[in-house]
Each structure stands twice: as C-alpha cells, then as structure tokens.
C-alpha cells in the first residue's frame, strides 16, 4: 500500500489525501494515511472497498478537521478492518446505501466514531468505538442492522455510545 500524508487544509475546501469520484470497484488496501484533512473521500461511487488501512490525523482545529473515511452518495461500500484515530468523524456516510461497515477500530475522534445520515439498508457489525465524543450517530435512516459493536469511554456533554435520531425498520442486537 501507499503512505499518504499532509494534504492541504482549508475551512472552505474539503481537501483529501485520496479523492475518489464517480468510480466503481475501487479497492483501498494496506495504506497509511497521516495528517490529512480528509483521508479518504468517495463521491458518487459504487462497489468500493476500504480494508486494512491505518488512518489518523493530528489536526486539532475543528474548522479544518475532516473525516477519516467520508462517503457521499455511494452504494455497496465495504469498509472493514481499518484502524482509525483522531479525526472529526472516523467513518462518515451520507446518502450511502446497501453497505457493510465491519471489524473497524475507531478511537479519539472529535465527534463520532461512525456517523451516518440518510443512509439505508446498511449493516455495521463487530466494530470497536472508544474515546470518541459519541460512539455512533445514526440519523434519518431505515433498514439498518447494528450487531455486536462495542462503544466505550465516550466523553463530553453528548457522550453517548449510540445516538439514534429517526431510525425505522432496523435491528439493534448484541451491542455493548
């Protein structure tokens, strides 16, 4: 894999170490991402995999801090076995459907370990979320399966393990 580090930073432009747009069947595997505003950003992509990567940021200003893995308008994404730390959100999904997020370790994020909105028919299982503002935030979603995730040592005024807002037709089992 590659080592990608020190992307540009801005409060107006979302710079990323790796930007993937309008793509199919991309695999990001065994890479190291350090000190990027956004480490991996997918837009309008399908059937992509992010697996066995090590991702962290040392950016401390919230205005320019980005997400480790950021997916927007994507389908059939597989995000697995990544070690993620010290980003705004560890994994962020918006308008992402039919995807699997599993066996990731996410810690030390300024907001959420996993944050997804308007994303349906997704499965997240066996992830470990620790020392984040909140473990996972699920908003405006349906048909989500959440199995055997661990949420521990969250901090701050909104320190939830699992924050849910408007979730329908979903299964939540075996989480602790």
Regions found by a protein language model. Give the residues of each.
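Right-handed parallel beta-helix/beta-spiral solenoid domain characteristic of secreted/periplasmic
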Residues: 1-13, 29
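Parallel beta-helix/beta-solenoid
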Residues: 15-18, 22-23, 28, 40, ...
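Short beta->alpha connector loops of Rossmann-like oxidoreductase domains
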Residues: 6, 35, 57
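A broadly tuned preference for mixed-charge, low-complexity surface segments
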Residues: 79, 83-98, 129-153, 158, ...
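Extracellular beta-strand/beta-solenoid scaffold signature
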Residues: 11-19, 34-38, 42, 62-72, ...
